[in-house]
Each structure stands twice: as C-alpha cells, then as structure tokens.
C-alpha cells in the first residue's frame, strides 16, 4: 500500500526539538492514518551538489535516474558545513548549538540526548531501524556507536554498506523500516583518477585556479563520485527487486560541500549547499 503521510510528518511526527517547529500528529494538515511507508536514507560524505543532476560534468547515472523519477531540490542547504554537526541537525531536527554536536563526533562531541535522534521518534510509531555504513554522530570511544544512537540493527561497515543494505532490503519485513545507508565517498583520500576522466580536461570548481594540480584533484574527485554512484545504484536496484519500492520514501543527500578550499567548513554556497533528491512513494512528479 502506498503511504500518503506527508514527508515532514514521517520524518519528525511530533512537537519541537531545540526550537525548530515540527508537525504535530493532530495537525489538521495530516491525512487520515495510512500504512506507514518505509524510509531509505542514503547519505554521502563531502559531495555538495557536484553530481550529474545538478549540471556538472560528472558521470553519476544512478543519481540522475533517481532525480528523473523523484524530486531534485536545487536550493537545499545543510545546517552546518562540518560532518557530524550537519548530520546531527538533520537527524534530530535541532540546531548543532542546541543538540550538543558542535563539532566532530570522533573529536569528543556528542548529542546531549540521543533519544532526540529520529530512530527513537520512528520507533515510537512502530518502525524498526538499521544502519549500514557511516553514521558519524556517535564515537567508538563511548561503545558501539549504533547502540549509542539507538539503531535496532547494525548491518556492516562503510566499505560493504551497499552490499549489506541490499541484503536487508531482500528480507521480508513485517514492520516499516528506517534504513540508513552511509558512504565514505566522496571524502578524501580519493581513490585515484578514473580512466574515463582525463585530468587534462577536468575543470576545477571556482574559485580554485585552473592548474594541472587542481585538474588532477578534480579528476580524482570525479572518480570517487563514480564509485559512490555505483554503490547507490546497487542499493536502488536491490530496492526495486525487493517489492518494497512502491511503499518506500527514498532520501538521498550529503552532509555538506566538497573538500576543496572555500567549500567544506565554510559558510558559503559551496560549503553549505548540498544535493537532495527524494523519490516517492506516490505523488512525486519527477525531476
């Protein structure tokens, strides 16, 4: 059955967190209760908007396909241009200076209250939760991060996130699920230049100077983006085979801008501008 609940109500169904207003379940704008939709949350590191659907000469056909069948947000911004703070804001609905994640999780920052994380809100509404790969809002210093956050299941480490996510999607599920699939790509270090991306013809992003070194750097970023796209495609193909696609909301985004000067860690459009693509279930015109 297709879920007809508004996206904002699915993501944060009640109250306010840290002064950020959220929909209340009794709000008159909500439709009558329907079968809850699954949520597939796909996220990358340091990608900004440097993918094919945003007009860049970077071959990401799976993300292009997702955009064509979903909705591409051209003016999406993160709440903070650093990894943990951005992710924590998105997943709690509260600003980093309110939720405690004012820096990086592996440098000692943490949420004041992990029960604010979306997995707890969704659990109260009957959801199961699973994490595959990167999370970056809890540290190994405090135990197993997925348990600290409150996920029901941990499926695998970053290098195998797409494989473990595909296995999860192939399982039968009696309850709606929130599946977080986190990728290391396109974080530095880059994997090296792809044969199809000749550095001599890779234009570096402004305001970087156009030099052989910056072209080589951009060529390597493009190779990382190709790898990210292939892994996302693996997950999306698994979703299509699973029978869950017609009742699954797909959210694909990144934490902040690319790891180049005046971008990541900077309050510029290049630092806080992020890709955001959402697809279905139902009611999405596409593009």
Residue ranges and their predicted role:
Residues 2, 13, 31-32, 208:
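Low-complexity intrinsically disordered segments
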Residues 2-5, 9, 19-22, 28:
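Short, low-complexity intrinsically disordered segments enriched in A/P/G/S/L with frequent Arg
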